[in-house]
Design a protein with these regions (language model features):
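N-terminal subdomain of nucleotide-sugar transferases
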Residues: 1-21, 51
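Short N-terminal targeting/anchoring amphipathic segment
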Residues: 20-38, 52-58, 168
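Short glycine-rich, flexible loops that bind phosphorylated cofactors or substrates
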Residues: 36-38, 62-63, 86
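A charged, aromatic-enriched C-terminal amphipathic alpha-helix characteristic of glycosyltransferases
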Residues: 101-122
Length: 241
């Protein structure tokens, strides 16, 4: 792995597709590092928040992984060649692996092709990650066994907002969409409160109502549960983008 690859991607990827390199609030992180405890800790920090990780090993092929490397849990391993990919699959059979050749070391690709492949990889990883998150949310909502579409939709949006809070990235449109849904929906308030209790998000919902009142356009009359401007509300305010 040449040291210039991360800079090549960061400096040029935005010209290929929709990927934008950011310093804060990433949707996906590409980690370049050695098989080490430090790398493991870095990746676990992102995956714990629910941020997908692509990992490129900076020290290439290794015959035996040290014990701490078993902690490594990237969403996808990027390898520069098939030999490295085969070794990863041998050591970690369940790993998701993608081979993208480094244009600095082979004539089988060029910079534009390589960047396009990384762009497509990032888009695919993010899309699949979001689909998995939504599937998990839908499964939780289905456990309510409620036919009221409005309650199901509101609970789904609250659960996604809870996930976004864990990622420390709350987009303003999420708040505005939830405000709109609450304002334009008719539902049984008692059933709604029971649903929030069943999902164990009643406390979180009270914090969200205060957030929507201060940072979006929701008013008290459209709240399914009383607002509470508490510590959680203040923490969420810090992560609105």
């Amino acid at each position: 792995l040449n040291k210039e690859l991360p800079d090549t991607i960061a400096d040029n990827i935005s010209s290929i597709g929709d990927v934008e390199v950011v310093d804060n609030a990433p949707d996906l992180v590409h980690v370049f590092g050695k098989w080490s405890g430090t790398t493991a800790t870095t990746m676990k920090g992102y995956t714990h928040k629910g941020i997908p990780v692509v990992f490129t090993s900076a020290n290439g092929l290794v015959d035996v992984l040290p014990p701490h490397s078993l902690m490594l849990a990237p969403t996808v391993f990027h390898c520069c060649g098939p030999a490295e990919a085969e070794l990863i699959k041998k050591l970690l059979p369940k790993a998701s692996v993608k081979v993208i050749a480094n244009e600095q070391f082979t004539l089988t690709t060029d910079r534009t092709t390589m960047l396009r492949q990384f762009n497509d990889l990032y888009a695919k990883v993010y899309s699949e990650h979001e689909a998995k998150v939504m599937s998990e949310i839908n499964n939780k909502v289905r456990t309510l066994n409620i036919s009221d579409h409005a309650i199901n939709e509101i609970c789904s949006q609250l659960l996604y907002l809870q996930y976004a809070f864990r990622r420390e990235t709350i987009r303003q449109r999420l708040l505005d969409n939830l405000s709109d849904t609450l304002i334009n929906s008719n539902y049984d308030e008692e059933s709604m409160r029971q649903a929030l209790d069943t999902l164990k998000i009643s406390s979180f919902a009270t914090s969200v109502m205060a957030l929507l009142e201060s940072k979006s356009h929701l008013t008290e009359g459209f709240m399914p549960i009383a607002a509470s401007d508490d510590k959680t509300t203040k923490q969420m305010q810090k992560h609105i983008i």
